[in-house]
Amino acid sequence: LPVILFAPSWGDGNALALKGVDIIAALIEEYEIILRPHVMSLIEDSQTLDIIRQRFGSHPRFSLDLSADSAPSIRRADLLISDWSGIAFEYALSFLKPVVFIDGPMKVFNPNWNRYLQEPGIEKSRRKSVGVIVSELTNLRPVINELLSSADVWTTRIMDARHELLFYPSECAAVSHRTLTLLAEHQTGTEWVRV
């Protein structure tokens, strides 16, 4: 049975609050579902989470992951469903597995972002490099089935995206350590250079 991790973001218009119950209901009979809500959703979307617990809490193919450690759920998942959460790219680029993005309002914490950037960033511009955007929930299961059945194609596609988006993908920890060491050695004054 394929394992689907549903890890939405939080804030206005997030997929959990708007469509969470419907998403789980549409998938629970065909897949194992792990819901991993954002920690802020425990406060902001507590009513939705209560409804989900009541409706699906005892279902053998449903689990609610509230652990501080996301790694076990991420590793188990064959596919991730999210909205505008950064976990989507972390998952896809780390595990070379596809993401289904539930279409909804873009998460914007700085409404003046376009004053400083020419493009909205990878969370908007590169979504189709690592997955498929779903606007209508009636398309959700067919899209998931297509992504799972074409996993090899998506692995290659996401690998290409990873090479375009990440610097030193297999050596990033060592390179980051060297960079921070150089910054520390050349630090002047008492403030760190903000990068």
Residue ranges and their predicted role:
Residues 26, 50-58, 120-128:
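Short, conserved catalytic or adaptor-binding loops enriched in Gly and charged residues
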Residues 137, 141, 170-181:
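Short, amphipathic alpha-helical "lid/cap" segments that border enzyme active or binding sites
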Residues 34, 63, 79-81, 100, ...:
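Hydrophobic/aromatic beta-strand patches that form the interior of the parallel beta-sheet core
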Residues 84-165:
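Catalytic binding pocket for nucleotide-activated donors in carbohydrate/polymer assembly enzymes
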Residues 1-52, 132-134, 148-152, 167-168, ...:
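Conserved catalytic-core segment of nucleotide-activated headgroup transferases in glycan assembly
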Residues 47-89:
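Donor nucleotide-activated moiety binding/catalytic core segment of transferases
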Residues 15-18, 45-48, 77, 89-94, ...:
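A short acidic (Asp/Glu
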Residues 9-13, 39-42, 70, 86-87, ...:
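Short, solvent-exposed loop/turn segments at secondary-structure junctions
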